[in-house]
Amino acid sequence: MPRSFLVKSKKTHTYNQHRYVEEQPVTGVDLVATVYHAHCTECPAEFPAFSTDPTEKQHTPENVITEEARSDPGDPREKIPFLSRSISPNSFQGIALSSMRPLKHYDPSPLSAFYTQNFSWDALHSTYGFKQIPSHIHPSMLQNSINLYSCPPRVDSDSDHPINYSMSYSPKMDTYHCVKCSKVFSTSHGLEVHVRRSHSGTRPFVCNICGKSFGHAVSLEQHLNVHSQERSFECKMCGKTFKRSSTLSTHLLIHSDTRPYPCQFCGKRFHQKSDMKKHTYIHTGEKPHKCQVCGKAFSQSSNLITHSRKHTGFKPFSCDLCCKGFQRKVDLRRHRENQHGLK
């Protein structure tokens, strides 16, 4: 028997030996080739169903055992997700994730012969287009939180631990979403700080002047500027001063004519998101602010505040010339123009 034939025969019968991680990492194609075998009816040879080895091509398709004859309900190979015996070498790399049916509860035990602790799934991830999870995410945040198949996560709304609010982490956008208020954060730390300040229910920092409580010392410090007359934030363009830096930042949008918030109904743009939201009530007809005395509803909270003064009789705007009081600032301005000739 020629030596070349013996080499090819040895190669044929040693090709499908299981290769473990200690020798070499198994790739996606090798995994399928290892799991799915075809047997020749003329000789004891066993080889991958879609093997491209020249020696194995000598076995004609008629001699390969069919899938129906090979299938066994108790065969562990039937439990492996996403794989099909009809896979060909050319079509394997182009398999779409949408055409695969994932198992709800995947049991890795059928793969015990091919999987070890150090097994690398990178090849399968790239082959099937799995969502890549950034390496800097701590494993504790991924547990019961990330779903590789984009299924909505089940969130325990009664849990107070801040980390539970990271369950809507989006690997594709690399962002973290608060499930309470839908705010988006770029880091897990930012989300945790937000939950601790806004949703934990604890406000240990109390204002000694008005009694309002806050969840963080910085918020209390910013609030104290409201009670003081100091306006330390000045606009360099018009000289107007403000008590808060955030108010100054909003004011600067007027000079730059930046209106980043458009109305989704009419396209009108606004400087602030709150103004845009109030404007949308005109299109939707929504009136979320209701008077507790007479039941009248308003689309804007400022209109409700002005309306409530009719029930209380409160007149915060007074004329400095005749001391007459008014419930609205616009009424005071008209009074000064009509009665005192001032503008």
UniProtKB/Swiss-Prot annotation:
Cite the GO molecular-function annotations of the record.
chromatin insulator sequence binding; DNA-binding transcription factor activity, RNA polymerase II-specific; RNA polymerase II cis-regulatory region sequence-specific DNA binding; zinc ion binding
Could you tell me which residues belong to the region SNAG domain? 1-20
How is this protein annotated for GO cellular component? chromosome; nucleus
One Gene Ontology term of the biological-process aspect is: chromatin organization
Q: Where is this region: Mediates repression of transcription?
A: 1-20
* Alphabetized SUPFAM superfamilies for the sequence: beta-beta-alpha zinc fingers (SSF57667)
The compartments listed are: Nucleus
Q: Which SMART domains match?
A: ZnF_C2H2
* Biological function: Essential transcriptional regulator necessary for development and differentiation of erythroid and megakaryocytic lineages. Alters histone methylation by recruiting histone methyltransferase to target genes promoters. Plays a role in heterochromatin formation.
Q: What is known of its domains?
A: The zinc finger domain is essential for erythroid expansion and acts as an activation domain whereas non finger domain serves as repression domain.
Q: What is this protein called?
A: Zinc finger protein Gfi-1b
Which species is this UniProt entry from?
Answer: Xenopus laevis (African clawed frog)
